[in-house]
Amino acid sequence: MSAVEQPPVYKIALGIEYDGSKYYGWQRQNEVRSVQEKLEKALSQVANEPVNVFCAGRTDAGVHGTGQVVHFETTALRKDAAWTLGVNANLPGDIAVRWVKAVPEDFHARFSATARRYRYIIYNHRLRPAILGHGVTHFYEPLDAERMHRAAQCLIGENDFTSFRAVQCQSRTPWRNVMHINVTRHGAYVVVDIKANAFVHHMVRNIVGSLMEVGAHNQPESWIAELLAAKDRRLSAATAKAEGLYLVAVDYPERFDLPKTPLGPLFLAD
């Protein structure tokens, strides 16, 4: 008796955008809303079989993504439009597929990634915003963006980020390699743009929290370098809120030839 022939398995990568303000983070959890759960449900409807996704970076509750990357495996052969338009039709309005690409067997959304890039958006005005209030962090004291930028440059390179690491972080090492960190002002908005090979838990938000203290002239420019050298989380500022944080890009080796989309969010140029 001949063995039953198994259907071929396809590996698919997707670019995902989402407003995380109504979700308890990316990762699927029991009895709470997660981005992963909504995406897997929509994909399973299109594939007509259960689908599990793996992401490049598991964002926390309230954090957004314009450049999240996921992959999944399926025996369902579908046109690209099914994985984009079809999946989007089954997703809530605050989650969307941006692109689709068939990938080789050795691709992994998390482990194949070589760098992640985040942007943190601060609405720097005396009064809080009503529009996009869950997409920015409001800070009412005047911020000196140029001062923040200068102070942040000491973080570039491979460093021990213990001072900017959440106490509950489960990473085996606090060492990370920061490729760039830029702070710029766009009218009432201050944008912190940071790229690294990977990030320890709450690293971006802890860095931003301390940079805001420097920008408000509550601490000297040298304070960030002092915190980095101290390797003590208790000395740095409070963690900045989740609302202003966006995962905007994930880098992969060129051989995977993944699509490039505008980083955003919204009007922000690349």
From Swiss-Prot:
Chain sites annotated for binding substrate: Y118
EC numbers on record: 5.4.99.12
InterPro entries: PsdUridine_synth_cat_dom_sf, PsdUridine_synth_TruA, PsdUridine_synth_TruA_a/b_dom, PsdUridine_synth_TruA_C, TruA/RsuA/RluB/E/F_N
A molecular function (GO) term: tRNA pseudouridine(38-40) synthase activity
Catalytic machinery residues: D60 (nucleophile)
Keyword tRNA processing listed: yes
Record region (Interaction with tRNA): 168-172
Site (Interaction with tRNA): residue numbering on this chain: R58, R78, R110, R126, F139
Gene3D superfamilies associated with the record: Pseudouridine synthase I, catalytic domain, C-terminal subdomain (3.30.70.660), Pseudouridine synthase I, catalytic domain, N-terminal subdomain (3.30.70.580)
Domain of life, per lineage: Bacteria
Disulfide bonding pattern of the chain: none
UniProtKB keywords: Isomerase, tRNA processing
Reaction catalyzed: uridine(38/39/40) in tRNA = pseudouridine(38/39/40) in tRNA
The keyword Transcription is annotated on this UniProt entry: no
GO biological process: tRNA pseudouridine synthesis
Quaternary structure note: Homodimer.
Annotated function: Formation of pseudouridine at positions 38, 39 and 40 in the anticodon stem and loop of transfer RNAs.
Family statement drawn from the similarity comment of this UniProt entry: Belongs to the tRNA pseudouridine synthase TruA family.
HAMAP family assigned to the protein according to its UniProt record, in alphabetical order: TruA (MF_00171)
Protein name: tRNA pseudouridine synthase A
Native organism: Citrobacter koseri (strain ATCC BAA-895 / CDC 4225-83 / SGSC4696)
